[in-house]
Design a protein with these regions (language model features):
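Low-complexity, Pro/Ser/Thr- and charge-rich linker/hinge segments at domain boundaries
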Residues: 98-124
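Structural beta-strand segments of beta-rich domains
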Residues: 27-31, 140-142
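Surface-exposed, short loops/turns at beta-strand junctions within beta-sandwich domains
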Residues: 68-76
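Short, compositionally biased P/S/T/A/G/V-rich stretches that sit at domain boundaries
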Residues: 1-24
Length: 153
């Protein structure tokens, strides 16, 4: 058995089950992959990494810098890696990642409530922020990325 057991973009796994889609703003993300074999001392002979039209033939697993066309903001990218070991066994795995805002200017409206929020330890009432929107077309895809200072520390 010889297989690619994980793929990493910017040192973060993109294959582990239950993981959210990885989002990066890096112009040239670093790609790595992990191999697994039931044979001792198995080594990588070569690998081919594809990200859209960019193809890299490599002999290493770690720190391969994407050198293709500039990545566009808010775009999904497929990654395919084919690895061959020292005995000619091969394994192929696919994954995806997405780019974030990158350097686009930010515009939007805050979703907030009318109350002035004061911090209370162990506040029993969670805050809800909602806004109704009306769309002219059907939604094809949507995602939300949320963060705030101190929430995830």
């Amino acid at each position: 058995m010889f297989e690619i057991s994980d793929i990493f973009i910017e040192e973060k796994s993109v294959l582990k089950e239950g993981k959210e889609l990885l989002i990066t703003d890096t112009d040239k993300p670093v790609i790595s992959f992990q191999l697994q074999s039931d044979r001792r001392e198995t080594s990588l002979r070569s690998a081919c990494i594809r990200v859209n039209n960019w193809i890299a033939e490599v002999k290493e697993q770690i720190g391969i810098k994407y050198e293709g066309e500039p990545l566009k903001p808010f775009t999904r990218y497929d990654v395919e890696i084919e690895a061959v070991d020292d005995r000619g066994n091969n394994s192929t795995k696919c994954a995806e990642f997405m780019t974030g805002r990158k350097r686009l200017p930010w515009s939007g409206k805050w979703i907030t409530d009318e109350m002035h929020v004061t911090e209370k330890p162990n506040s029993p009432r969670p805050l809800y922020f909602r806004r109704k929107i009306h769309l002219e077309k059907a939604v094809e895809e949507s995602w939300i990325v949320v963060t705030a200072v101190g929430i995830f520390d």
